[in-house]
């Protein structure tokens, strides 16, 4: 029977009992921590849909709990309000009694009362007693009401804490649900594999800790057994000595027994009998000590056998856990490979789409030239930056004569409005296509250098920046960077020609002479 995932904590799946669940991509969810053979069963893996469904179930359960807690909070608030009203009513009643008594006692006496002080004191005494009797019952009721109110207040605070914790867990569950919904199928598979690997590693760590504890106990028990063995050897030697002395005295008693009835010669017999009895007691005590030591030794030996059996079982569990880790690692590697292949496919599709766009906008010839530049950049080393700059400047001067300043400023206006998140997306796609690592942060430097050209007219800082990156990461990175500029911004025909000219200057200067023809300039 499969174990359902109730929730995730720190990336590790747990069931509704709080136990870690190990889910192999080619096996069943397993919350028991046992099993063998590396979990190579033929049942289906936990799919991303199941993970997503679990997240939704967890959110729904928390919302249900939240509603139940809200109902309990409402009931507690009503109980508290009722207790408070009861307490306040009793408090007011008690105040009324006291005020009535004080009003009665504060009445000014008549002349006759002044003449009869004894009668007045009696009335006051009777009034005080009545007041005490009248107050006693409401005071007890008020104390009970106050206790009920405090209990209701305590319960209200406890429910508030429960609600706050449920709200926190609900937010985490909702965030997890949203995050899972945003993942691709391959990315979810990677996440499942990562969580399964983490769970398997956690299980192995627990087993290793258990084995270490058992080994410590085994070492201690063996030490105790050795000590008891030495003690037993000593006790047996003492028993043998006591037995020998007893036998010696027993033989003497037997030898002297014929004289036992002779008053003149019976004394040696009775002395030997007394000594034999004492030696018998000593021998019995030594036997008890030997028996007790043997019992302890047997207990320790039994404990050692139990520990050794537990270690054997733990080692079997460890072998299973290691096998699961290997399977989880293999599954993770497979999932990561599938994800990478999917990303590369997406990148290739995006790149092909990019070339198709180039074909539609600038013709097949330009698209073909762009592909040739990309292919030539693979593994190519940077050429002399001054030579590249000189070749580019020559091409640029010819190009500038064909375009107005407004046309030339289009590239600067486009880069000033660039959205770096779009650029980063294209940069990542082209980088995967050429199998290199792309960093959009480097693009900020390039954009900054290009924007400065509008004011300075100096292209050398840009070429030095590109040269440095080409030296560090290869010419392919320059291609990736500039292709992402072409894909992510609208540069105008002059901008397209300039970017292409930069690429040709670094990769193939001979193509500088064909750019205008290819673009139809």
From Swiss-Prot:
**TM region(s), chain numbering:** 470-486, 493-509
Among PROSITE patterns, the record links this protein to:
CHANNEL_COLICIN
Q: Where is the composition biased (Basic residues)?
A: 133-145
| Functional note | This colicin is a channel-forming colicin. This class of transmembrane toxins depolarize the cytoplasmic membrane, leading to dissipation of cellular energy.
State the compartments where it is located.
Cell membrane
Q: Which domain of life is it from?
A: Bacteria
GO biological process terms, semicolon-separated: defense response to Gram-negative bacterium; killing of cells of another organism
**Stored Pfam families:** Colicin
Organism encoding this protein: Shigella sonnei
Composition bias, kind Gly residues: at what positions?
30-42
Spell out the family assignment given in the record's similarity comment.
Belongs to the channel forming colicin family.
- Membrane topology according to the record: Multi-pass membrane protein
The name on file for this protein is: Colicin-E1*
- Keyword rRNA processing carried by entry: no
Alphabetical keyword list: Antibiotic, Antimicrobial, Bacteriocin, Cell membrane, Membrane, Plasmid, Transmembrane, Transmembrane helix
> Region (Disordered): which ranges?
26-52, 127-163
- What Gene Ontology molecular-function terms does this entry list? pore-forming activity
GO CC, one annotated term: plasma membrane
Extract the InterPro entries matched here: Channel_colicin_C (IPR000293), Channel_colicin_C_sf (IPR038283)
Q: Give me the stretches of Basic and acidic residues compositional bias.
A: 146-163
């Amino acid at each position: 029977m499969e174990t359902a995932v109730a929730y995730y904590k720190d990336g590790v799946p747990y069931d509704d009992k709080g136990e870690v669940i190990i889910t192999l991509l080619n096996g069943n969810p397993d919350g028991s921590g046992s099993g063998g053979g590396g979990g190579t069963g033929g049942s289906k893996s936990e799919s991303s849909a199941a993970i997503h469904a679990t997240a939704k179930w967890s959110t729904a359960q928390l919302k249900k709990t939240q509603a139940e807690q809200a109902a309990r909070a409402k009931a507690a608030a009503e109980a508290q309000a009722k207790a408070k009203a009861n307490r306040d009513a009793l408090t007011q009643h008690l105040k009324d009694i006291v005020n009535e008594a004080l009003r009665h006692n504060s009445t000014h006496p008549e002349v006759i009362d002044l003449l009869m002080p004894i009668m007045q004191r009696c009335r006051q005494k009777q009034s005080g007693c009545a007041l005490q009797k009248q107050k006693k019952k409401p005071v007890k009721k008020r104390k009970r009401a106050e206790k009920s109110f405090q209990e209701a207040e305590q319960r209200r605070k406890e429910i508030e804490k429960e609600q706050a914790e449920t709200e926190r867990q609900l937010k985490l569950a909702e965030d997890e649900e949203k995050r899972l919904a945003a993942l691709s199928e391959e990315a979810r598979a990677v996440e499942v594999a990562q969580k399964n690997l983490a769970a398997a590693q956690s299980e192995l760590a627990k087993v290793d800790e258990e084995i270490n504890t058992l080994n410590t106990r085994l070492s201690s028990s063996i030490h105790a057994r050795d000590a008891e063995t030495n003690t037993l050897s000593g006790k047996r030697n003492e028993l043998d000595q006591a037995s020998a002395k007893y036998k010696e005295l027993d033989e003497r008693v037997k030898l002297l027994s014929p004289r036992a009835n002779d008053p003149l010669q019976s004394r040696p017999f009775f002395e030997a009998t007394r000594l034999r009895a004492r030696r018998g007691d000593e021998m019995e005590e030594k036997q008890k000590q030997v028996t007790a030591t043997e019992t302890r030794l047997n207990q320790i030996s039994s404990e050692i056998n139990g520990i050794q059996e537990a270690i054997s079982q733990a080692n079997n569990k460890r072998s299973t856990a290691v096998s699961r880790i290997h399977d989880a690692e293999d599954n993770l590697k497979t999932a990561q490979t599938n994800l990478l292949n999917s990303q590369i496919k997406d990148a290739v599709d995006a790149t092909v789409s990019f070339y198709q766009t180039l074909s539609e906008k600038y013709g097949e010839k330009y698209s073909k030239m762009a592909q040739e530049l990309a292919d030539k950049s693979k593994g190519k080393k940077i050429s002399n930056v001054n030579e590249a700059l000189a070749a580019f400047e020559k091409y640029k001067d010819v190009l500038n004569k064909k375009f107005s300043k407004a046309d030339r400023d289009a590239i600067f206006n486009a880069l000033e409005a660039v959205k770096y998140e779009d650029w980063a997306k294209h940069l990542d796609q082209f980088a995967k296509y050429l199998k290199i690592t792309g960093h959009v942060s480097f693009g900020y430097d390039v954009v900054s250098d290009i924007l400065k050209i509008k004011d300075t007219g100096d292209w050398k800082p840009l070429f030095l920046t590109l040269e440095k990156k080409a030296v560090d990461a290869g010419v392919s990175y320059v291609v990736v960077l500039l292709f992402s500029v072409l894909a992510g911004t609208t540069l105008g025909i002059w901008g397209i020609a300039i970017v292409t000219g930069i690429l040709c200057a670094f990769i193939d200067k001979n193509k500088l002479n064909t750019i205008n023809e290819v673009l139809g300039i």
